[in-house]
From Swiss-Prot:
Organism (species): Staphylococcus saprophyticus subsp. saprophyticus (strain ATCC 15305 / DSM 20229 / NCIMB 8711 / NCTC 7292 / S-41)
Protein name in UniProt: Large ribosomal subunit protein uL30
Cross-referenced HAMAP family: Ribosomal_uL30_B
Subunit description: Part of the 50S ribosomal subunit.
GO cellular component term of the entry, any: cytosolic large ribosomal subunit
């Protein structure tokens, strides 16, 4: 399966709790931190919820 590199580009300060939890569930902690995860429907759904806060690249 393909891998995705997700980078937190905007801060979660002032965002709703659900968006903060989603960012945390993706494994992102600080602004500009990145994680590489497997591409699957669950991860894609999480990315869609916080798409305005993250950037995604295919690896």
């Amino acid at each position: 399966m393909a891998k995705l590199q997700i980078t937190l580009t905007r801060s979660v300060i002032g965002r709703p709790e659900t968006q903060r939890k989603t960012v945390e569930a993706l494994g992102l902690k600080k602004t500009n931190s990145s994680v590489v995860v497997e591409d699957n429907p669950a991860i894609r759904g999480q990315i869609n919820k916080v798409s305005h806060l993250v950037t995604v690249e295919e690896k």
